[in-house]
Amino acid sequence: MTKTLKIIEVKSEIGAGTRGASLGVDAIKIAALDFGSRFFKKHKSIEVPNENHLLLEGTGSPYAKRISGILTMVERVSDQVRTTLEEKEFPVVLAGDHSTAAGTIAGIKAAFPKSKLGVIWIDAHADIHSPYTTPSGNMHGMPLAMSLDEDNLESKVNKLDQETINYWFQLKNVGNIAPKINYRDLVLISARDMEKPEEYLLKKNKVKIFTTADVRKRGVERTVIDTLVYLDHCDLIYVSFDVDSMDPTASRGTGTPVAQGLTEREAGKLMSGLITNQKVCCFEIVEVNPTLDRENQMAEHAFEILIKATNAFRNE
């Protein structure tokens, strides 16, 4: 079945610790032009207004930097994803930093509140910190905690002020559904850089993780099958792809590169394999940062993965 794509552009980077991720969406568009592709002409797109002006101001809470702006962005992305799904279109989210993924998840739940949502998180990081456990305060490390309604107080290291506590509560409750996903409905792929509080949660909740080594040992096709079988009880599936899941040898054009990642070919096969599943209702590519790159390599890789994925479900 051919799906009508709608590209949702989220040029936000207030959740990241390094600057430049907000330029990633346009870098992917430039890569498309360089490849002579009409992809961005063929599919309609909408840009979500951003709060990047906050980068010129103070960070606010040291344990939840620019949290007021993050809340605004999560709400805006949620509204746009919900509207897109309600209009029977397939949202393809191209975003800067990964914090706004909490908005993508919130939007899917707003459109389908009674559906069980599975999440496939392809990322070097678990992104499951809360303001109570974060070592950096950068909120692109927290979207899954927002969606899981997770404070992880057992691993608490930071004392929060009341304003931060209030904003964090609001973030977890965007759309008045909390939690939006469950640990049993989550699969991490290529996760390899976690702190102790995150490892504690993943172990405690028996989260399904396929490391890069697992992917290579099983093969991409088997990994796709095993992931989808594991999430077979879910009604809908959302796939979020952070380009830092790929190895830095492919490109360093992302804010938090980590060795021992996927190759561009493995990532492309993985995404195109997952996307063909009928339950997949949305996918996302995040964290391309052309300011850290050479010759726009990462954006080119991201665009190639985008094309492989969309071609897979459009049967082109």
Residues covered by each model-derived region:
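Conserved alpha-helical scaffold segments that buttress catalytic/binding sites
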Residues: 2-316
